[in-house]
Protein backbone atom coordinates (compact mmCIF):
# COMPACT_ATOMS: atom_id res chain seq x y z
CA UNK A 1 0.00 0.00 0.00
CA UNK A 2 1.04 3.61 -0.56
CA UNK A 3 1.31 5.94 2.38
CA UNK A 4 -1.26 8.77 2.11
CA UNK A 5 1.52 11.29 1.39
CA UNK A 6 2.82 9.04 -1.45
CA UNK A 7 6.34 9.09 -0.02
CA UNK A 8 6.48 5.49 1.09
CA UNK A 9 5.30 2.04 0.06
CA UNK A 10 4.50 -0.61 2.65
CA UNK A 11 4.29 -4.27 1.73
CA UNK A 12 4.29 -7.81 3.10
CA UNK A 13 7.07 -10.27 2.33
CA UNK A 14 6.89 -13.98 3.12
CA UNK A 15 9.52 -16.57 4.00
CA UNK A 16 8.87 -20.03 5.40
CA UNK A 17 11.22 -19.38 8.33
CA UNK A 18 10.36 -15.77 9.22
CA UNK A 19 6.70 -15.90 8.06
CA UNK A 20 5.12 -12.56 7.06
CA UNK A 21 7.07 -9.37 7.61
CA UNK A 22 5.83 -5.83 6.99
CA UNK A 23 8.40 -3.78 5.09
CA UNK A 24 8.58 -0.10 4.21
CA UNK A 25 10.55 1.49 1.38
CA UNK A 26 10.80 5.01 -0.01
CA UNK A 27 8.67 5.52 -3.11
CA UNK A 28 11.75 6.82 -4.95
CA UNK A 29 13.50 3.50 -4.29
CA UNK A 30 16.14 2.28 -1.88
CA UNK A 31 16.57 -0.43 0.71
CA UNK A 32 13.42 -1.80 2.33
CA UNK A 33 13.28 -1.95 6.12
CA UNK A 34 11.30 -4.53 8.08
CA UNK A 35 9.06 -3.44 10.93
CA UNK A 36 9.80 -5.02 14.29
CA UNK A 37 6.55 -6.87 15.00
CA UNK A 38 5.61 -10.33 16.33
CA UNK A 39 5.92 -13.27 13.96
CA UNK A 40 2.80 -14.54 12.23
CA UNK A 41 1.04 -15.25 8.97
CA UNK A 42 -0.20 -11.80 7.97
CA UNK A 43 -2.03 -10.77 4.83
CA UNK A 44 -4.31 -8.01 3.44
CA UNK A 45 -2.30 -4.95 4.47
CA UNK A 46 -4.12 -1.59 4.72
CA UNK A 47 -3.28 1.91 5.99
CA UNK A 48 -5.41 4.63 7.58
CA UNK A 49 -5.77 8.21 6.33
CA UNK A 50 -3.23 9.54 8.82
CA UNK A 51 -0.62 7.11 7.59
CA UNK A 52 0.31 6.15 11.14
CA UNK A 53 -1.71 2.96 11.61
CA UNK A 54 -1.78 -0.21 9.52
CA UNK A 55 -4.27 -3.07 9.53
CA UNK A 56 -3.59 -6.71 8.70
CA UNK A 57 -5.34 -10.04 8.97
CA UNK A 58 -3.54 -12.80 10.85
CA UNK A 59 -4.12 -16.38 9.70
CA UNK A 60 -4.23 -19.52 11.79
CA UNK A 61 -1.96 -22.40 10.92
CA UNK A 62 -2.88 -24.75 8.10
CA UNK A 63 -1.83 -28.02 6.53
CA UNK A 64 0.26 -26.07 4.01
CA UNK A 65 1.76 -23.19 5.99
CA UNK A 66 3.74 -23.23 9.22
CA UNK A 67 1.31 -24.02 12.08
CA UNK A 68 3.42 -22.09 14.59
CA UNK A 69 2.71 -18.49 15.66
CA UNK A 70 -0.99 -19.00 14.97
CA UNK A 71 -2.56 -18.01 18.29
CA UNK A 72 -5.51 -15.60 18.11
CA UNK A 73 -6.02 -15.13 14.35
CA UNK A 74 -8.07 -12.17 13.17
CA UNK A 75 -7.72 -8.45 12.49
CA UNK A 76 -4.85 -6.46 13.98
CA UNK A 77 -3.73 -2.84 14.05
CA UNK A 78 -0.02 -2.12 13.64
CA UNK A 79 1.80 1.10 14.48
CA UNK A 80 3.70 2.09 11.36
CA UNK A 81 6.80 3.37 13.16
CA UNK A 82 7.13 1.04 16.14
CA UNK A 83 5.58 -2.16 14.80
CA UNK A 84 3.48 -2.54 17.95
CA UNK A 85 0.43 -4.73 17.30
CA UNK A 86 -3.05 -4.65 18.82
CA UNK A 87 -5.65 -7.38 18.38
CA UNK A 88 -9.00 -6.00 17.21
CA UNK A 89 -11.40 -8.79 16.27
CA UNK A 90 -11.65 -12.41 15.21
CA UNK A 91 -14.29 -11.35 12.66
CA UNK A 92 -13.79 -10.24 9.09
CA UNK A 93 -11.23 -10.12 6.33
CA UNK A 94 -9.89 -7.50 3.90
CA UNK A 95 -9.66 -4.78 6.58
CA UNK A 96 -9.68 -1.11 5.56
CA UNK A 97 -10.40 2.25 7.15
CA UNK A 98 -13.37 4.57 6.69
CA UNK A 99 -13.66 8.36 7.03
CA UNK A 100 -14.78 8.04 10.64
CA UNK A 101 -11.58 6.28 11.67
CA UNK A 102 -13.43 2.99 12.20
CA UNK A 103 -12.13 -0.29 10.87
CA UNK A 104 -14.16 -1.91 8.08
CA UNK A 105 -14.02 -5.54 6.94
CA UNK A 106 -16.10 -8.06 5.04
CA UNK A 107 -17.40 -11.45 6.09
CA UNK A 108 -19.66 -14.16 4.77
CA UNK A 109 -23.24 -13.75 5.97
CA UNK A 110 -24.19 -17.34 5.17
CA UNK A 111 -22.58 -20.59 6.20
CA UNK A 112 -22.63 -22.01 2.67
CA UNK A 113 -19.26 -22.89 1.19
CA UNK A 114 -20.00 -21.07 -2.05
CA UNK A 115 -20.51 -24.10 -4.27
CA UNK A 116 -24.09 -24.21 -5.43
CA UNK A 117 -25.57 -22.04 -2.70
CA UNK A 118 -28.13 -19.43 -3.72
CA UNK A 119 -27.73 -17.71 -0.34
CA UNK A 120 -23.98 -17.08 -0.43
CA UNK A 121 -23.89 -13.39 0.46
CA UNK A 122 -21.14 -11.13 1.76
CA UNK A 123 -21.57 -8.27 4.21
CA UNK A 124 -19.47 -5.21 4.99
CA UNK A 125 -19.12 -4.54 8.71
CA UNK A 126 -17.52 -1.75 10.70
CA UNK A 127 -16.16 -1.70 14.24
CA UNK A 128 -14.31 0.55 16.61
CA UNK A 129 -10.54 0.21 16.73
CA UNK A 130 -10.95 -1.83 19.88
CA UNK A 131 -13.22 -4.29 18.05
CA UNK A 132 -16.44 -3.17 19.74
CA UNK A 133 -19.66 -1.63 18.40
CA UNK A 134 -19.82 -3.90 15.34
CA UNK A 135 -22.31 -2.63 12.76
CA UNK A 136 -23.48 -4.12 9.48
CA UNK A 137 -22.98 -1.54 6.74
CA UNK A 138 -23.79 -3.23 3.42
CA UNK A 139 -24.67 -6.59 1.93
CA UNK A 140 -24.21 -8.05 -1.55
CA UNK A 141 -25.41 -11.44 -2.68
CA UNK A 142 -22.68 -13.59 -4.25
CA UNK A 143 -20.07 -10.82 -3.91
CA UNK A 144 -16.41 -11.67 -3.35
CA UNK A 145 -15.23 -8.18 -2.33
CA UNK A 146 -16.85 -5.07 -0.80
CA UNK A 147 -14.80 -1.98 0.01
CA UNK A 148 -15.88 1.44 1.24
CA UNK A 149 -14.13 4.49 -0.21
CA UNK A 150 -11.88 6.36 2.26
CA UNK A 151 -14.20 9.39 2.05
CA UNK A 152 -17.24 7.17 2.69
CA UNK A 153 -19.16 8.40 -0.36
CA UNK A 154 -19.01 5.30 -2.57
CA UNK A 155 -18.73 1.54 -2.27
CA UNK A 156 -16.89 -0.69 -4.75
CA UNK A 157 -17.69 -4.38 -4.95
CA UNK A 158 -16.94 -7.41 -7.12
CA UNK A 159 -19.87 -9.55 -8.19
CA UNK A 160 -19.82 -12.18 -10.94
CA UNK A 161 -16.09 -11.37 -11.28
CA UNK A 162 -16.95 -7.81 -12.46
CA UNK A 163 -16.00 -4.63 -10.59
CA UNK A 164 -18.94 -2.36 -9.72
CA UNK A 165 -19.28 1.10 -8.18
CA UNK A 166 -22.24 2.09 -6.02
CA UNK A 167 -22.86 5.82 -5.55
CA UNK A 168 -24.15 5.76 -2.01
CA UNK A 169 -22.92 6.50 1.50
CA UNK A 170 -23.67 4.29 4.51
CA UNK A 171 -26.16 5.48 7.12
CA UNK A 172 -26.05 4.52 10.79
CA UNK A 173 -28.36 1.64 11.62
CA UNK A 174 -29.12 0.86 7.97
CA UNK A 175 -27.75 -1.95 5.80
CA UNK A 176 -27.26 -1.01 2.17
CA UNK A 177 -28.22 -3.74 -0.31
CA UNK A 178 -25.75 -3.78 -3.19
CA UNK A 179 -27.17 -5.29 -6.37
CA UNK A 180 -25.53 -4.95 -9.76
CA UNK A 181 -28.59 -6.18 -11.68
CA UNK A 182 -31.43 -4.40 -9.82
CA UNK A 183 -29.78 -1.49 -8.00
CA UNK A 184 -31.67 0.73 -5.58
CA UNK A 185 -29.21 3.58 -6.24
CA UNK A 186 -26.80 4.45 -9.08
CA UNK A 187 -24.54 1.43 -9.64
CA UNK A 188 -22.08 1.15 -12.51
CA UNK A 189 -19.98 -1.66 -13.90
CA UNK A 190 -16.39 -0.41 -14.07
CA UNK A 191 -14.59 -3.42 -15.53
CA UNK A 192 -14.82 -4.73 -19.06
CA UNK A 193 -13.68 -8.31 -18.49
CA UNK A 194 -13.52 -8.45 -14.69
CA UNK A 195 -10.76 -8.06 -12.15
CA UNK A 196 -9.27 -8.67 -8.73
CA UNK A 197 -7.33 -6.74 -6.07
CA UNK A 198 -9.91 -4.02 -5.56
CA UNK A 199 -8.49 -0.79 -4.07
CA UNK A 200 -9.21 2.91 -3.56
CA UNK A 201 -6.80 5.81 -3.76
CA UNK A 202 -6.13 7.84 -0.61
CA UNK A 203 -8.96 10.37 -0.97
CA UNK A 204 -11.59 8.06 -2.49
CA UNK A 205 -11.63 9.85 -5.84
CA UNK A 206 -10.61 6.79 -7.89
CA UNK A 207 -11.01 3.03 -7.70
CA UNK A 208 -8.56 0.51 -9.13
CA UNK A 209 -8.20 -3.19 -9.78
CA UNK A 210 -6.07 -5.53 -11.86
CA UNK A 211 -6.85 -7.96 -14.65
CA UNK A 212 -3.83 -10.20 -14.87
CA UNK A 213 -0.80 -7.94 -15.26
CA UNK A 214 -2.87 -4.89 -16.23
CA UNK A 215 -3.57 -2.33 -13.52
CA UNK A 216 -6.67 -0.24 -14.21
CA UNK A 217 -7.90 2.92 -12.51
CA UNK A 218 -11.15 4.80 -13.02
CA UNK A 219 -11.77 8.24 -11.46
CA UNK A 220 -15.19 8.32 -9.80
CA UNK A 221 -16.03 11.57 -11.58
CA UNK A 222 -15.42 9.93 -14.97
CA UNK A 223 -17.49 6.89 -14.07
CA UNK A 224 -20.46 9.05 -13.11
CA UNK A 225 -20.54 10.96 -16.39
CA UNK A 226 -23.15 9.91 -18.99
CA UNK A 227 -21.78 7.57 -21.62
CA UNK A 228 -19.02 6.09 -19.43
CA UNK A 229 -17.39 3.01 -20.95
CA UNK A 230 -15.19 0.60 -18.98
CA UNK A 231 -11.48 1.03 -19.81
CA UNK A 232 -10.10 -1.20 -22.52
CA UNK A 233 -6.47 -1.03 -21.42
CA UNK A 234 -4.48 -0.26 -18.29
CA UNK A 235 -0.90 -0.04 -17.10
CA UNK A 236 1.04 -3.23 -17.75
CA UNK A 237 2.87 -4.24 -14.57
CA UNK A 238 4.45 -7.42 -15.92
CA UNK A 239 8.20 -7.94 -15.84
CA UNK A 240 10.56 -10.33 -17.58
CA UNK A 241 12.22 -12.95 -15.40
CA UNK A 242 14.61 -15.61 -16.64
CA UNK A 243 13.21 -19.13 -16.55
CA UNK A 244 15.20 -21.63 -14.52
CA UNK A 245 17.42 -23.74 -16.77
CA UNK A 246 20.15 -26.09 -15.57
CA UNK A 247 23.48 -25.96 -17.39
CA UNK A 248 24.40 -29.56 -16.55
CA UNK A 249 25.14 -32.36 -19.00
CA UNK A 250 24.20 -35.81 -17.76
CA UNK A 251 24.37 -39.28 -19.27
CA UNK A 252 22.07 -41.78 -17.55
CA UNK A 253 23.53 -45.19 -18.38
CA UNK A 254 22.73 -48.90 -17.90
CA UNK A 255 19.08 -48.13 -17.16
CA UNK A 256 15.92 -49.85 -18.30
CA UNK A 257 14.38 -47.08 -20.41
CA UNK A 258 10.67 -46.80 -21.19
CA UNK A 259 10.33 -44.72 -24.36
CA UNK A 260 7.55 -42.78 -26.00
CA UNK A 261 8.66 -43.37 -29.56
CA UNK A 262 6.20 -44.64 -32.15
CA UNK A 263 6.95 -48.27 -31.27
CA UNK A 264 6.87 -47.64 -27.49
CA UNK A 265 10.19 -49.46 -27.22
CA UNK A 266 11.60 -50.61 -23.90
CA UNK A 267 15.41 -50.55 -23.89
CA UNK A 268 16.86 -52.97 -21.34
CA UNK A 269 20.30 -51.36 -21.14
CA UNK A 270 19.72 -47.83 -22.31
CA UNK A 271 21.35 -44.43 -22.24
CA UNK A 272 19.61 -41.07 -21.89
CA UNK A 273 21.52 -37.86 -22.61
CA UNK A 274 20.31 -34.74 -20.80
CA UNK A 275 21.59 -31.31 -21.77
CA UNK A 276 20.24 -28.35 -19.87
CA UNK A 277 16.47 -28.74 -19.69
CA UNK A 278 16.20 -30.98 -22.76
CA UNK A 279 16.52 -34.69 -23.53
CA UNK A 280 19.20 -34.70 -26.20
CA UNK A 281 19.14 -38.38 -27.13
CA UNK A 282 17.78 -41.78 -26.09
CA UNK A 283 19.37 -45.03 -27.18
CA UNK A 284 20.87 -48.36 -26.18
CA UNK A 285 24.31 -48.92 -24.69
CA UNK A 286 25.95 -48.21 -28.05
CA UNK A 287 24.83 -44.56 -27.97
CA UNK A 288 27.95 -42.40 -28.05
CA UNK A 289 28.41 -40.17 -25.01
CA UNK A 290 29.99 -36.84 -25.98
CA UNK A 291 32.79 -35.28 -23.99
CA UNK A 292 31.68 -33.16 -21.07
CA UNK A 293 28.77 -35.36 -20.01
CA UNK A 294 28.80 -36.62 -16.42
CA UNK A 295 27.83 -40.29 -16.36
CA UNK A 296 25.38 -41.66 -13.78
CA UNK A 297 25.19 -45.46 -13.60
CA UNK A 298 21.54 -46.52 -13.10
CA UNK A 299 21.99 -50.28 -13.27
CA UNK A 300 18.90 -51.96 -11.83
CA UNK A 301 16.83 -48.80 -12.19
CA UNK A 302 14.08 -47.85 -14.65
CA UNK A 303 13.79 -44.45 -16.33
CA UNK A 304 10.32 -43.40 -17.48
CA UNK A 305 9.02 -40.19 -19.07
CA UNK A 306 7.61 -37.70 -16.59
CA UNK A 307 3.96 -38.25 -15.74
CA UNK A 308 1.35 -35.57 -16.47
CA UNK A 309 -1.40 -35.31 -13.84
CA UNK A 310 -4.07 -33.61 -15.91
CA UNK A 311 -6.51 -33.20 -12.99
CA UNK A 312 -4.53 -32.19 -9.90
CA UNK A 313 -6.01 -29.86 -7.28
CA UNK A 314 -3.35 -27.98 -5.28
CA UNK A 315 -3.00 -26.52 -2.76
CA UNK A 316 -0.54 -23.81 -3.86
CA UNK A 317 -0.93 -21.17 -1.17
CA UNK A 318 -3.32 -19.35 1.09
CA UNK A 319 -4.55 -15.75 1.06
CA UNK A 320 -1.86 -14.74 -1.46
CA UNK A 321 0.90 -16.44 0.55
CA UNK A 322 2.90 -18.87 -1.61
CA UNK A 323 5.14 -21.07 0.57
CA UNK A 324 8.73 -21.56 -0.51
CA UNK A 325 8.38 -25.29 0.13
CA UNK A 326 5.10 -27.00 -0.74
CA UNK A 327 4.79 -30.63 0.35
CA UNK A 328 2.06 -31.29 -2.22
CA UNK A 329 4.24 -30.20 -5.14
CA UNK A 330 7.24 -32.07 -3.74
CA UNK A 331 5.19 -35.26 -3.34
CA UNK A 332 4.00 -35.05 -6.94
CA UNK A 333 7.56 -34.53 -8.14
CA UNK A 334 8.94 -37.36 -6.01
CA UNK A 335 6.38 -39.73 -7.54
CA UNK A 336 7.45 -38.81 -11.07
CA UNK A 337 4.83 -36.18 -11.92
CA UNK A 338 6.61 -33.43 -13.85
CA UNK A 339 3.52 -31.53 -15.06
CA UNK A 340 0.21 -30.83 -13.33
CA UNK A 341 -2.98 -29.26 -14.62
CA UNK A 342 -5.56 -27.96 -12.16
CA UNK A 343 -9.08 -27.65 -13.67
CA UNK A 344 -10.47 -25.62 -10.74
CA UNK A 345 -8.30 -23.32 -8.70
CA UNK A 346 -7.71 -19.70 -7.68
CA UNK A 347 -5.85 -17.51 -10.16
CA UNK A 348 -3.99 -15.45 -7.57
CA UNK A 349 -2.49 -18.61 -6.07
CA UNK A 350 -2.05 -21.13 -8.87
CA UNK A 351 -0.53 -18.77 -11.44
CA UNK A 352 1.77 -17.20 -8.83
CA UNK A 353 3.00 -20.69 -7.93
CA UNK A 354 3.34 -21.58 -11.63
CA UNK A 355 5.51 -18.54 -12.30
CA UNK A 356 7.62 -19.17 -9.20
CA UNK A 357 8.17 -22.78 -10.31
CA UNK A 358 9.09 -21.74 -13.84
CA UNK A 359 11.58 -19.19 -12.48
CA UNK A 360 13.09 -21.73 -10.09
CA UNK A 361 11.94 -19.91 -6.96
CA UNK A 362 10.06 -22.99 -5.71
CA UNK A 363 10.55 -26.66 -6.48
CA UNK A 364 7.72 -28.53 -8.14
CA UNK A 365 6.26 -29.76 -11.42
CA UNK A 366 5.28 -27.42 -14.24
CA UNK A 367 1.88 -25.99 -13.32
CA UNK A 368 -1.05 -25.19 -15.61
CA UNK A 369 -4.61 -24.35 -14.63
CA UNK A 370 -8.02 -23.07 -15.60
CA UNK A 371 -8.04 -20.99 -12.38
CA UNK A 372 -11.61 -20.14 -11.30
CA UNK A 373 -14.30 -22.19 -12.99
CA UNK A 374 -16.84 -20.52 -15.29
CA UNK A 375 -19.57 -21.64 -12.94
CA UNK A 376 -23.26 -21.68 -13.74
CA UNK A 377 -24.56 -22.20 -10.19
CA UNK A 378 -25.36 -19.34 -7.83
CA UNK A 379 -22.34 -18.95 -5.55
CA UNK A 380 -19.43 -16.60 -5.02
CA UNK A 381 -17.86 -18.44 -7.98
CA UNK A 382 -20.90 -17.56 -10.12
CA UNK A 383 -19.98 -16.55 -13.66
CA UNK A 384 -23.18 -15.44 -15.41
CA UNK A 385 -23.33 -16.20 -19.14
CA UNK A 386 -26.33 -14.86 -21.03
CA UNK A 387 -24.55 -13.60 -24.16
CA UNK A 388 -21.42 -14.41 -26.12
CA UNK A 389 -19.93 -11.16 -24.81
CA UNK A 390 -20.41 -12.46 -21.25
CA UNK A 391 -18.55 -15.64 -22.14
CA UNK A 392 -15.78 -13.70 -23.88
CA UNK A 393 -15.33 -11.51 -20.81
CA UNK A 394 -14.85 -14.53 -18.53
CA UNK A 395 -12.46 -16.26 -20.92
CA UNK A 396 -10.42 -13.08 -21.51
CA UNK A 397 -10.15 -12.43 -17.78
CA UNK A 398 -8.83 -15.92 -17.12
CA UNK A 399 -6.50 -15.82 -20.12
CA UNK A 400 -5.07 -12.49 -18.94
CA UNK A 401 -4.32 -14.07 -15.57
CA UNK A 402 -2.45 -16.99 -17.12
CA UNK A 403 -4.97 -19.66 -18.13
CA UNK A 404 -4.38 -21.86 -21.17
CA UNK A 405 -7.56 -23.81 -20.40
CA UNK A 406 -10.93 -22.80 -18.94
CA UNK A 407 -13.44 -24.90 -17.00
CA UNK A 408 -16.92 -24.78 -18.56
CA UNK A 409 -18.59 -25.89 -15.36
CA UNK A 410 -22.30 -26.67 -15.01
CA UNK A 411 -23.72 -23.77 -16.97
CA UNK A 412 -27.35 -24.94 -16.86
CA UNK A 413 -28.39 -24.37 -20.50
CA UNK A 414 -26.76 -25.90 -23.54
CA UNK A 415 -26.56 -22.54 -25.36
CA UNK A 416 -24.63 -21.10 -22.39
CA UNK A 417 -22.12 -23.93 -22.59
CA UNK A 418 -21.86 -23.41 -26.34
CA UNK A 419 -21.07 -19.72 -25.79
CA UNK A 420 -18.19 -20.61 -23.46
CA UNK A 421 -16.84 -23.06 -26.04
CA UNK A 422 -17.10 -20.47 -28.82
CA UNK A 423 -15.44 -17.79 -26.66
CA UNK A 424 -12.62 -20.23 -25.90
CA UNK A 425 -12.16 -20.98 -29.60
CA UNK A 426 -11.93 -17.26 -30.40
CA UNK A 427 -9.40 -16.63 -27.63
CA UNK A 428 -7.26 -19.68 -28.39
CA UNK A 429 -7.72 -21.46 -25.06
CA UNK A 430 -8.93 -25.01 -24.45
CA UNK A 431 -12.31 -25.50 -22.74
CA UNK A 432 -12.72 -28.51 -20.47
CA UNK A 433 -15.92 -29.46 -18.70
CA UNK A 434 -17.56 -31.70 -16.18
CA UNK A 435 -20.90 -33.23 -17.05
CA UNK A 436 -22.10 -33.17 -13.46
CA UNK A 437 -22.76 -36.93 -13.45
CA UNK A 438 -25.17 -36.46 -16.38
CA UNK A 439 -24.56 -38.73 -19.37
CA UNK A 440 -26.52 -36.57 -21.81
CA UNK A 441 -24.67 -33.41 -20.78
CA UNK A 442 -21.37 -35.16 -21.48
CA UNK A 443 -22.61 -36.17 -24.94
CA UNK A 444 -23.81 -32.61 -25.63
CA UNK A 445 -20.46 -31.18 -24.60
CA UNK A 446 -18.59 -33.55 -26.90
CA UNK A 447 -20.84 -32.68 -29.83
CA UNK A 448 -20.47 -28.96 -29.16
CA UNK A 449 -16.67 -29.05 -29.37
CA UNK A 450 -15.35 -29.38 -25.83
CA UNK A 451 -11.62 -30.08 -25.60
CA UNK A 452 -11.92 -32.55 -22.76
CA UNK A 453 -14.33 -34.13 -20.28
CA UNK A 454 -13.34 -34.16 -16.60
CA UNK A 455 -14.59 -37.02 -14.39
CA UNK A 456 -16.09 -40.26 -15.59
CA UNK A 457 -19.27 -40.67 -17.59
CA UNK A 458 -21.73 -42.13 -15.03
CA UNK A 459 -22.70 -45.30 -16.88
CA UNK A 460 -21.60 -48.89 -16.36
CA UNK A 461 -20.85 -49.52 -20.05
CA UNK A 462 -20.18 -47.38 -23.12
CA UNK A 463 -21.14 -49.01 -26.41
CA UNK A 464 -19.66 -48.67 -29.87
CA UNK A 465 -21.90 -45.78 -30.93
CA UNK A 466 -20.54 -43.62 -28.10
CA UNK A 467 -16.97 -44.79 -28.70
CA UNK A 468 -17.11 -43.89 -32.40
CA UNK A 469 -18.79 -40.55 -31.68
CA UNK A 470 -16.28 -39.65 -28.99
CA UNK A 471 -13.19 -40.80 -30.88
CA UNK A 472 -14.11 -38.81 -33.98
CA UNK A 473 -14.52 -35.67 -31.87
CA UNK A 474 -10.94 -36.05 -30.51
CA UNK A 475 -12.15 -34.75 -27.14
CA UNK A 476 -10.02 -35.89 -24.24
CA UNK A 477 -11.25 -37.94 -21.30
CA UNK A 478 -9.96 -37.60 -17.74
CA UNK A 479 -11.96 -40.09 -15.64
CA UNK A 480 -10.27 -39.05 -12.34
CA UNK A 481 -10.52 -42.53 -10.90
CA UNK A 482 -9.93 -41.31 -7.35
CA UNK A 483 -13.23 -39.38 -7.59
CA UNK A 484 -15.91 -41.24 -9.52
CA UNK A 485 -19.60 -41.01 -10.36
CA UNK A 486 -21.76 -44.09 -9.93
CA UNK A 487 -19.27 -46.43 -8.30
CA UNK A 488 -16.44 -46.98 -5.85
CA UNK A 489 -13.35 -44.83 -6.09
CA UNK A 490 -9.84 -46.18 -6.53
CA UNK A 491 -8.80 -44.25 -3.43
CA UNK A 492 -10.97 -46.60 -1.37
CA UNK A 493 -9.41 -49.57 -3.17
CA UNK A 494 -5.92 -48.56 -2.08
CA UNK A 495 -7.03 -48.02 1.51
CA UNK A 496 -8.61 -51.49 1.45
CA UNK A 497 -5.84 -53.46 -0.27
CA UNK A 498 -2.62 -51.63 0.60
CA UNK A 499 -1.00 -49.99 3.60
CA UNK A 500 -0.90 -46.53 2.09
CA UNK A 501 0.76 -44.92 5.09
CA UNK A 502 3.81 -47.18 4.64
CA UNK A 503 4.63 -45.92 1.14
CA UNK A 504 8.12 -44.43 1.61
CA UNK A 505 7.64 -41.40 -0.64
CA UNK A 506 4.20 -40.55 0.72
CA UNK A 507 5.44 -40.98 4.28
CA UNK A 508 8.39 -38.69 3.55
CA UNK A 509 6.57 -35.84 1.82
CA UNK A 510 2.90 -35.91 2.85
CA UNK A 511 2.13 -34.81 6.43
CA UNK A 512 -0.27 -36.95 8.48
CA UNK A 513 -3.90 -35.89 8.37
Q: Where in this protein do the model-derived segments appear?
A:
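Divalent metal-dependent hydrolysis catalytic cores, especially in the metallo-beta-lactamase
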Residues: 328-348, 365-373, 399-411, 421, ...
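Histidine-rich, glycine-flanked metal-binding segment
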Residues: 263-304
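Active-site neighborhoods of metal-dependent hydrolases
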Residues: 393-412, 458-513
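Divalent metal-coordination and catalytic microenvironments
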Residues: 255, 272, 277, 300, ...
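Conserved blade-ending motifs and adjacent loop-strand segments that build the rim/top face
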Residues: 138-143, 181-199
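A flexible loop/linker signature enriched in serine peptidases of the S9 family
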Residues: 1-4, 10-23, 27, 36-43, ...
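Surface-exposed loop and turn segments in beta-propeller and other repeat-based domains
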Residues: 172-189, 230-235
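Metal-associated gating/positioning segment near the N- to mid-region
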Residues: 301-359, 379-380, 386-389, 415, ...
